[in-house]
Amino acid sequence: AGTYYYLHRFVYDNPKSEEVINSIWNNMYNAIANVNILLQGIEDHRGILAADEEKIYEGEAYALRAFLHFDLLRLFGKSYVSGAGEKAIPYVSKISKEITPLSTVSEVLDSVITDLEKAAFLLENDPVRTGEATTSFLGTRSFHFNYYAVRALMARVYLYKNDKVNALKNATEVILSHKYPWVEKGQVATTTRDNRDGIFLTECILMLNNTRLETITETYLKKSENNTVGNLLVTQAEVRDEIFENTLYGGSDWRYIYYFEPIDSYYVNTKLWQVSSSYNNRQPLLRISEMYLIAAECAGSKKEALEYFNTLRQHRGFEVTDDLKEEDTTDEKLQTAIGKEYRKEFIGEGQWFFYCKRTDQATLPNVQVPFSKAYYVLPIPDQELEYGNRN
């Protein structure tokens, strides 16, 4: 697509690429500044809010600060496995005119975990756990950084840090809560898109109410008189078949059947199309499927790992006969299969790129240019380097 042509080819110093990268950096740190203002306001005015509400707002703020910094780290810092001790990004934890120094990858992850631990403590009596919301604003907890979203993010962060024990602990807590049931086939396998659940709504632990989704999907995922295929984010038919292992599993995967629409000789991903009012403006950030993949990767035994892995695939249209068997599955084969599921499950969401970065993959399939691991790290904007004395 036009705006992302150079990013798609990892040309980060092109003006169009720099515009996108600078916007990500500036907007996310602006959001962090607003979170810090909120936290300072809560600290300076204790007792104005009811005690239970104050804890929830404060807990959500700590969680959001951690979430924003973690994604900045995944974009602008090296992976933990390739550069734990290398300088990455500033972790801004207070309102100050002073320049925040860069922290290492490991230090950022420690700060993220510290904020998430504070959030989990403050959200202990979250309405998502008690079932009692004192105000309407505190309802519909999947639109807020709720307690289980904190645990899910902790699972993601700990795995990024290669701490599989704590990653498994947090992932299984979310799984065992039974708060996020698998989507029913009838919600996905609809005859038209008018009432199709493209995001598997019941499985969403945390999501955005993104009122710009229609504009985004109309711009990048739908063809019109003024929007040709050359401007769209499209997938070649053979690449779609490869991603979903069509020759091996016969195209039974719901994500293969119901996530795409043909346009000319290509396909576009449709899961975020704004068709049904029941699912409008909903953009998933954390889902129960990721917890199953994390549990599969971190489980203490192969039997347990395969139970998590096969359960996920059975709820995506796979037959029990397609289950991976313990006697036929090496550790390497299981890890490869987990990577393939990340690619299928989070297509169009970016999580598979971060999976490849976390696991230090030397190559990426279907890229337009020869790949280098250097492409995993976005450049910090020049303005930040200049005025932050980062050079």
Predicted segment positions?
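Hydrophobic-face positions in mid-chain alpha helices that act as interaction patches
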Residues: 144, 165-288, 368-391
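Conserved, well-structured interaction surfaces
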Residues: 2-76, 98, 102-104, 123, ...
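Structural motif corresponding to the intra-repeat A-B loop/turn of tetratricopeptide repeats
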Residues: 72, 161, 300-302
